[in-house]
Amino acid sequence: MKMKILLIGGGGREHAIAEGIKKSKHNPILYALMAKKNPGIAALCEDFLLEKETEVEKVVEYAKARKIEMAFVGPEAPLAAGVADALWDAGIPVVGPKKACAIIEFDKAWARNFMKKYGIEGCPAYEVFTEEAPAHAFIEKLGDVAVKPSGLTGGKGVKVMGDQLPDIKAAREYTSELLEKGPVVIEERFIGEEFTLQAFVDGKNLAFFPAVQDHKRAYEGDIGPNTGGMGSYTDAGEILPFMVPEDIEKAKKIMQHTVTALREETGTGYQGILYGQFILTSRGPKVVEFNARFGDPEAMNVIPLIETDFVEIMSAVTKGTLGDLPVKFSRKATVCKYAVPAGYPDNPKKDSEVIVGDIGEASVYYASVYEKEGKIYTTTSRAVAVVGCAETIEAAEKVAQNALENIQGELFFRRDIGTASLIQKRIDHMKELRG
């Protein structure tokens, strides 16, 4: 009997997960539940339901009706809503942590307090505030700060001094604005190069993916407003060109400690994807944040590199047997680039047709688009991602860039992601910081 698997979520990340599942030698039958029809996911599915991914009862109802045997939750919102808990309660194993553990992403204040309680390395000096006067005083005291809303913001709520906040006055004003909606985390600003480390987790064991570097700024040269991520790259191997092996080993230890501490704190094993966003400083890797799911775009870099059967990995995650399964990756470099609507992220042009031409050797992943009468149109978010995979970053970048040149529509993208000049800038920056 072929296994019936349900995928929850409808973005570019979920398109990559769907592809990973469908490549399995076990020929699983894939079902999807997504808020909007993703044409890439729909094409890989036996059947799908268009429904809000946070409607817990509807998710369980659909899973039972389709006799689902295992589920994968892609985005953070359904995890925060307790979708994984409800599916487990219905006897359906899930890749995606229960709410008690997913809190590490959806409550930034909880996450920092948890790190402090368990002595998890890489935690900045920070405080959590609900009132203006002490928050403003703490900003004055620290001087160089990052200001974060405590809840989920789709990766766009954090503002940092020297970047989006030109001075202390701006930091105070932004803090006051956020405090109207809820608690605010104010922490020391780290200076360095960011990287993402993701892992499959079975409650105890972690299987790490190669490190990825994402590019949050909208425009070339790392300028402009923050976005959900304009593109990312991996090198052939597990570290990035500006890293040394010791950096990734330290980051792995932090994530392992986090998983062990989560079990102790919550009484529940963390089963799913743990995403560590790190910043590599002169004092080693520090934790920017943890997420309870794959990154988007980072998922599209790493999923195509998995050589071990994806469904077997999912099964091991749900059974706690990841330690018995060697998870292998091909030693190739990848470059992912997003084509986004003109005006994104502040004033995106929606309902504009997207025509995907000859993309050559690249992979294409549909994100926030919709299909109407056989044509594909933009919404207000990132539209289509392309991924080049090759022996070197430079070669992978060319594959991705050539594919983008053959996608038509009122779109733009960053040509500089994965290029030698931008990577050299990162290497030089780290050399300077390390002295």
Swiss-Prot record:
Instruction: Name the residues that bind ATP.
Output: 139-196
> Per the entry, which co-factors are needed?
Mg(2+); Mn(2+)
Binding residues for Mg(2+) 1, per the UniProt record? 277, 289
Write out the residues that bind Mn(2+) 1: 277, 289
**Pfam families with a match to the protein in the record:** GARS_A, GARS_C, GARS_N
Offer an example of a GO molecular function term for this protein. phosphoribosylamine-glycine ligase activity
Pathway per the UniProt entry: Purine metabolism; IMP biosynthesis via de novo pathway; N(1)-(5-phospho-D-ribosyl)glycinamide from 5-phospho-alpha-D-ribose 1-diphosphate: step 2/2
> What catalytic activity does the UniProt entry give for this protein?
5-phospho-beta-D-ribosylamine + glycine + ATP = N(1)-(5-phospho-beta-D-ribosyl)glycinamide + ADP + phosphate + H(+)
Q: Which GO terms describe its biological process?
A: 'de novo' IMP biosynthetic process; purine nucleobase biosynthetic process
Give start and end of each ATP-grasp domain: 112-319
Q: Which residues bind Mn(2+) 2?
A: 289, 291
UniProt entry keywords in alphabetical sequence:
ATP-binding, Ligase, Magnesium, Manganese, Metal-binding, Nucleotide-binding, Purine biosynthesis
Question: For this protein, what does the record note about how its cofactor is bound?
Answer: Binds 2 magnesium or manganese ions per subunit.
Among InterPro entries, the record links this protein to: ATP-grasp, ATP_grasp_subdomain_1, PreATP-grasp_dom_sf, PRibGlycinamid_synth_ATP-grasp, PRibGlycinamide_synth, PRibGlycinamide_synth_C-dom, PRibGlycinamide_synth_C_sf, PRibGlycinamide_synth_CS
What superkingdom heads the lineage? Archaea
The EC number(s) given in the record are 6.3.4.13
The family assignment reads: Belongs to the GARS family.
Its name, as the record gives it, is Phosphoribosylamine--glycine ligase
In its UniProt entry, the species of origin is given as Methanosarcina mazei (strain ATCC BAA-159 / DSM 3647 / Goe1 / Go1 / JCM 11833 / OCM 88) (Methanosarcina frisia)
